[in-house]
């Protein structure tokens, strides 16, 4: 190895010991690929090609996040058509469970196969699932479609960030991630608005059909556009023949998937279909814990070839970025579910109008996501945005916990806006931190870990929020409306209880609903405080340092 290549190896590989282990365990074709990677110069995308790439992956992230929340306002119509009230929980959990089970494995796909074609393959599976949901003629068919769409979504966020890593240098990524996440999270928070509009003025099936024409547009944007990879990749046929069985850790996947499914099923069943102390829920939790223990032992045995490598779990920035992402996504899911409940239950707004009432939050989040991304690219440091966003989130959710049936429009709009600014500032911080800290083969795997943490954060804290909401509501109704029938009100649902409550009891029931929503926002305050703590772990590093090093190397080469 030449003298001028040695510093480059040290800068680009934070785990040289792992590189040595890879060299020992690899076959000749792997060694050739490693040599190519050492000399590989990335091809950054510019101009109209960059616009097409960013537009394509932004639309995909938007659809993925939209699909998580759009079904919430369509569920009443779906259950009426299919007479399937008992399947309500599965319309959301089938998507989440299948996505979480596959997410860690997606890092391996993006490591060894073309990012563009892997991304389009996962997106294609997502589109097939959407089509099945749209044409479903039974509740079971709809659940199967949601599960297929979840499998497709498992590789979409990781793929979007992997493509971005190969398309633009690290200094420009904060701006691009700000745009992608700013627009993408419009789908998560605006899903109830879109779903309410389709359900009210057309049919719930368009909640899924809409993915198809947008998918065709994504195909036009990406299919014929050259998207460079972060590193040279072997031909797919050679990878499938010589790499998949040795490197993809399918045993780890076979252990991780059922462990995840059992945990998420326990969270789904607990307090809904079964009590938390039931044999079913306890059995699922115990089975999940035991399987996760076996999975951890297997991953330790596999070393650097593990689906979730130990050196990444021990990496402080990856670890804290994943935890931060979990807290962000958990509090975002709670916000997207319980603000509409406040507007529809307490303020008697329609599904469509309640979605419109979320606009202060949505627009402020979009503006701050773009502004923070641009300023991070200019100034270099992303940690301040994480701390600043966490503070705004804590303040905003603290104010949201004071909502009542008589809260004025300027007040709740201001509270929403504060949370929107906070979420916009912090959302992209974990992604930037990981892409800035992790290099080479580990980028896709680290991003898969982060997206998996996101999914678990959403599922776990949404379940905790549901427990808090249900228990508080059951306590507060007798307190504020002593003569009301608690079981009848709860069974009627968040929008149907008005038909079963007398005019005398209605103010008390509305106050009970408002207090129950407030109690869930206390959980969001706690998650925001956790964001503040974990944000300090993402590292005080600058995305501009890599560019400065590259410029110094170019000057050395020119002088030589």
Curated annotation (Swiss-Prot):
Residues 1-38 are annotated as: Disordered. InterPro entries: MFS (IPR011701), MFS_dom (IPR020846), MFS_trans_sf (IPR036259). Pfam families: MFS_1. MFS-type transporter; part of the gene cluster that mediates the biosynthesis of oxopyrrolidines, polyketide-amino acid hybrid compounds with feature structures of tetramic acid. This is MFS-type transporter opdM. Residues 24-37 have a biased composition (Polar residues). Its main location: membrane. The keyword DNA repair does not apply. Signal peptide: none annotated. Disruption phenotype: Does not affect the production of oxopyrrolidines A and B. Belongs to the major facilitator superfamily. TCR/Tet family. It is found in: Membrane. Glycans are attached at residues 35, 500. GO terms for cellular component: plasma membrane. One of its GO terms (molecular function) is transmembrane transporter activity. The gene is opdM. CDD domains: MFS_Azr1_MDR_like. It comes from the Eukaryota. PANTHER family: MAJOR FACILITATOR SUPERFAMILY, MULTIDRUG TRANSPORTER, PUTATIVE (AFU_ORTHOLOGUE AFUA_8G00940)-RELATED. It is a multi-pass membrane protein. It comes from Penicillium oxalicum (strain 114-2 / CGMCC 5302) (Penicillium decumbens). The keyword Phosphoprotein does not apply. The chain crosses the membrane at residues 45-65, 117-137, 148-168, 176-196, 204-224, 250-270, 278-298, 317-337, 351-371, 379-399, 449-469, 520-540. Keywords: Glycoprotein, Membrane, Transmembrane, Transmembrane helix, Transport. The lineage of its organism: Eukaryota, Fungi, Dikarya, Ascomycota, Pezizomycotina.
């Amino acid at each position: 190895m030449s003298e001028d290549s040695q510093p480059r190896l040290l800068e680009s590989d934070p785990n040289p010991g792992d590189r040595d282990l890879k060299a020992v365990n690899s076959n000749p074709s792997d060694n050739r690929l490693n040599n190519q990677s050492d000399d590989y110069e990335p091809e950054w995308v510019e101009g109209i090609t960059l616009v097409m790439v960013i537009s394509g992956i932004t639309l995909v992230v938007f659809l993925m996040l939209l699909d998580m929340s759009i079904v919430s306002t369509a569920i009443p119509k779906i259950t009426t058509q299919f007479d399937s009230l008992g399947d309500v929980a599965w319309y959301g959990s089938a998507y989440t469970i299948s996505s979480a089970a596959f997410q860690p494995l997606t890092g391996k796909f993006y490591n060894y196969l073309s990012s563009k074609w892997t991304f389009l393959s996962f997106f294609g599976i997502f589109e097939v699932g959407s089509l099945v949901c749209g044409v479903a003629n039974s509740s079971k068919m709809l659940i199967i479609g949601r599960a297929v769409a979840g499998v497709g979504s498992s590789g979409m966020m990781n793929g979007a960030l992997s493509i971005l890593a190969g398309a633009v240098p690290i200094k420009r990524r904060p701006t691009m991630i700000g745009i992608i996440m700013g627009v993408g999270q419009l789908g998560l928070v605006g899903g109830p608005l879109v779903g309410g509009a389709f359900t009210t003025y057309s049919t719930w099936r368009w909640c899924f059909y809409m993915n198809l024409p947008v998918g065709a547009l994504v195909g036009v944007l990406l299919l014929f556009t050259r998207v460079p990879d972060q590193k040279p990749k072997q031909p797919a046929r050679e990878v499938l023949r010589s790499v998949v069985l040795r490197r993809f850790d399918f045993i780890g996947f076979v252990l991780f998937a059922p462990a995840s499914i059992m945990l998420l099923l326990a969270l789904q069943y607990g307090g809904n279909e079964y009590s938390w102390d039931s044999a079913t829920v306890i059995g699922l939790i115990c089975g999940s814990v035991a399987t996760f223990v076996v999975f951890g032992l297997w991953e330790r045995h596999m070393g650097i070839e593990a689906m979730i490598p130990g050196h990444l779990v021990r990496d402080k920035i990856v670890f804290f970025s994943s935890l931060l992402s979990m807290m962000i996504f958990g509090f975002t899911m709670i916000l997207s579910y319980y603000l509409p409940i406040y507007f529809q239950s307490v303020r008697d707004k329609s599904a469509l109008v309640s979605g419109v009432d979320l606009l202060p939050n949505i627009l402020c989040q979009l503006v701050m996501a773009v502004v923070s991304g641009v300023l991070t690219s200019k100034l270099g440091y992303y940690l301040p945005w994480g701390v600043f966003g966490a503070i705004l989130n804590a303040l905003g959710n603290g104010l949201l916990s004071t909502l009542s049936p008589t809260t004025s429009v300027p007040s709740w709009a201001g509270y929403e806006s504060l949370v929107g600014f906070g979420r916009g500032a912090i959302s992209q911080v974990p992604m930037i931190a990981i892409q800035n800290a992790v290099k080479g083969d580990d980028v896709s795997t680290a991003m898969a870990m982060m997206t998996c943490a996101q999914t678990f954060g959403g599922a776990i804290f949404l379940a905790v929020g549901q427990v808090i909401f249900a228990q508080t509501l059951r306590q507060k109704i007798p307190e504020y409306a002593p003569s009301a029938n608690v079981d009848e009100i709860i069974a009627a649902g968040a929008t149907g209880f008005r038909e079963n409550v007398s005019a005398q009891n209605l103010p008390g029931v509305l106050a009970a609903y408002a207090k129950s929503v407030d109690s869930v926002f206390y959980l969001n305050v706690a998650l925001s405080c956790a964001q503040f703590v974990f944000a300090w772990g993402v590292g005080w590093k600058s995305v501009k340092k890599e560019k400065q090093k590259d410029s110094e190397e170019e000057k050395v080469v020119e002088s030589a």
